[in-house]
Amino acid sequence: MAGHSKWANTKHRKAAQDAKRGKIFTKVIRELVTAAKLGGGDAGSNPRLRAAMDKALANNMTRDTMNRAIARGVGGDDDSNMETIIYEGYGPGGTAVMVECLSDNRNRTVSEVRHAFTKTGGNLGTDGSVAYLFTKKGVISYAPGLDEDAVMDAALEAGADDVMTYDDGAIDVFTAWENMGAVKDVLDAAGLQADSAEVTMIPSTKADMDAETAPKLLRLIDMLEDCDDVQEVYHNGEISDEVAETL
């Protein structure tokens, strides 16, 4: 598959994301502890843990910090009763938004999530209101510069579902979310260094953002990501290069 690069849509947010590094670490540690607590400390048989480990390493977390978090979960040293909660809603410009949370207090979490939607002109929906528009997938991303044919051949041989190449040479490899770790291992062994690997929700349709709605969508995402209980924000908003340059 060929397509338009997502890199332009994300690069203008990198500085803000870097500023949130400390908060990201806290959230990744929480996910590591929870994944290990629920599914055990073996990443080979616990795809949720493997995905959390890949995210931790992508954010430059040390293996020592990561292993301590896993040990906390496996050893039962963490006495919090965290549960995964998914909220669905509509953002600026009719965007479909899914918010994945880890929380020990539903009332606090839903209040913060609803506030973010309301402040940016969106609204929190009911269960199932937008979930049907998304599919859970593993995505292994490669920065421009690699041999596209080499990545594609290795990915498909490793059992990937699909490979998308972009105009600027960036490449995304899509997998069943449970198989992402195994596919990445094969690609790593082939000498193909990924820029990132994550489990995400892929939208089946896109909502084009213009110069008016794009800033509102980005504000919604930032407000949600600032909530301590929010782990991930997924949406189907599409920001063109032209609009991104104005932000």
UniProtKB/Swiss-Prot annotation:
It is found in: Cytoplasm. It holds the Pfam family Transcrip_reg. SUPFAM superfamilies: YebC-like. Keywords: Cytoplasm, DNA-binding, Transcription, Transcription regulation. One of its GO terms (molecular function) is DNA binding. One of its GO terms (biological process) is regulation of DNA-templated transcription. Residues 1-20 are annotated as: Disordered. One of its GO terms (cellular component) is cytosol. Its main location: cytoplasm. InterPro entries: Integrase-like_N, TACO1_YebC-like_2nd/3rd_dom, TACO1_YebC_N, Transcrip_reg_TACO1-like, Transcrip_reg_TACO1-like_dom3, YebC-like. Belongs to the TACO1 family. This is Probable transcriptional regulatory protein ETA_14870.
